[in-house]
Amino acid sequence: MSLQEVRRQRNLSQRECAERSGVNVRILQFYEQGIRDINGAKLVTLLKLCNALDCGLGEILTDEETLKELEIYIRK
């Protein structure tokens, strides 16, 4: 699944998602359009998005290796 798919499932506009998460709407658009790789996002940004969308990291990250590394880091 992608960030955009999760956001749409929650019936949120980009602006609403940005406001809920505190992530700049332009940055959110860049992640959704692939201009910026969400797998390289700061952990704090990922967590803000997950909290706003009520989802897990695995639902918005597209790279399995990145997800595994983050899960290991968070468990420490």
Regions found by a protein language model. Name each.
Residues M1-Q9:
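A short, Lys/Arg-rich alpha-helix, primarily the initiator
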Residues R8, E19, N51:
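Alpha-helical residues within the helix-turn-helix
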Residues R8, G22, Q33-I35, E65:
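Residue-level detection of the helix-turn-helix DNA-binding "recognition helix"
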Residues L12-Y31:
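Short alpha-helical DNA-recognition segment
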Residues L43-E59:
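DNA major-groove recognition helix of helix-turn-helix/homeodomain DNA-binding modules
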Residues G58-K76:
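Short, charged recognition helix plus adjacent turn
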